[in-house]
């Protein structure tokens, strides 16, 4: 795979070896480096992957015709109801049911939701394709 990415060749190598089940110690021996260095390479690769995902989510959110602000004190049920209502107004079919929406929102905004109640504000967008984008940078 020779496509351009935000990963260095070394990061790609380490991730490929980890995916094959290799321990950091075994990778370090193979690459003639320390386990600590392998750990640092893997950690930086995961940070780059997360930044790439966040960038893609940001770009998708720019194209989201539906955006709702989830405010402190809102319940997950209220958020889902508003999200579905606003999507319906725009003629957009959300590709998930309410249970899956609750799971996805809680997963993406886990540190902002406690016991199904929003503790700090964030936004959710819905793309024309019905995909949900949770924007924690709002």
Curated annotation (Swiss-Prot):
The keyword Transcription applies. Keywords: Activator, DNA-binding, Transcription, Transcription regulation. Belongs to the Tfx family. The lineage of its organism: Archaea, Methanobacteriati, Methanobacteriota, Methanomada group, Methanobacteria. InterPro entries: RNA_pol_sigma70_r4 (IPR007630), Tfx_C (IPR029291), Tfx_DNA-bd_arc (IPR004645), Tfx_DNA-bd_euryarc (IPR018384), Tfx_DNA-bd_sf_arc (IPR036657). This is DNA-binding protein Tfx. Transcriptional activator of the fmdECB operon. The gene is tfx. GO terms for biological process: DNA-templated transcription initiation. The keyword DNA-binding applies. It holds the Pfam family Sigma70_r4. One of its GO terms (molecular function) is DNA binding.
